[in-house]
Amino acid sequence: MYPAILELPDQILGRKVPTDWAWWMKYVGTVLASDLTPEEQFDVILLNTFREIPQNEAGHFQGVLDFYFCGDPPHGDEPAPPERLLDWKKDALRIWGDFRVYAGIDLFTARMHWWQFMSIFRSLPPESQIKNAI
């Protein structure tokens, strides 16, 4: 059993959600980085995550953002975190290469929680390809 500090969430407002890094990158990260309007992003992300538009739309959407930002969403007065400056699709090979080189993880076969992925991503060294790109 892991200590409580290492428990990874698998629910948003009591509803089970996907946790795999690739799912979050594809169905939330790319939508947030898309040219869709904020209203379209809102609906697409809710439908992707819950397969419906929940009754408490705003609360569920905020829950998705909290999950996506690993419990530490940016505040209005803070600059966007570096991961928002990249294009998950365009930068995929850089990210894959950096995970292989610096963490010994092959993202083509790896299964891990989104928060684990982001923890490793954020800890990549400044000389990594992706950190140089952003």
Label every PLM stretch briefly.
Residues 1-23, 30-134:
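Charged interaction scaffolds used for protein-protein
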